[in-house]
Amino acid sequence: MNAKEIAKKIMDSSHVGTMATVEANKPFSRYMTFYHEDFTLYTATSKKTEKVDELEKNPNTHILLGYNDEGYGDAYLEIAGTVTISDEVRLKKKIWNEHMKPWFDGPEDPNLVILKVSPDAIRVMNKKGESPETITF
């Protein structure tokens, strides 16, 4: 498989990853649940979070996704991207699932926003002894 095929396979099977933002020149990471179309990632959050404040100031993010098996040599992705914050109801309905109910009243909840991550580069790591490979967009 080539790097794009490996990345797509990891994105299809891995939904929980870390998302980093920057505040006062310091990185902050948190676990997020991701959905994707092609190589664009989407994740839901409340517009009242620190991460939204941070992304409004600096839309750059770094995401780790994958590393699901034993933890030794598992392939994973390092994704550098730019975030767009959307409150578009069509997109919220598309991303909505029942797991979001504890935090939101539904896809039309005014506090729900979708973070759209457009990748600048995806680095495929730990490919069974092969060197990392970077996909640029």
Locations of the language-model features?
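Extreme N-terminal tail/first-helix region
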Residues: 1-17, 136-137
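Charged, amphipathic alpha-helical segments
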Residues: 2-4, 48-49, 98-100
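Short Pro/Gly-enriched beta-strand edge/turn motifs at strand-loop
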Residues: 13-18, 95-99
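Short beta-strand segments
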Residues: 14-48, 55, 62-67, 75-78
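Structural motif
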Residues: 40-41, 60, 82, 121
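Short, intrinsically disordered, mixed-charge
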Residues: 54-61, 97, 101
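Charged, gly/pro-rich active-site loop segments
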Residues: 75-137
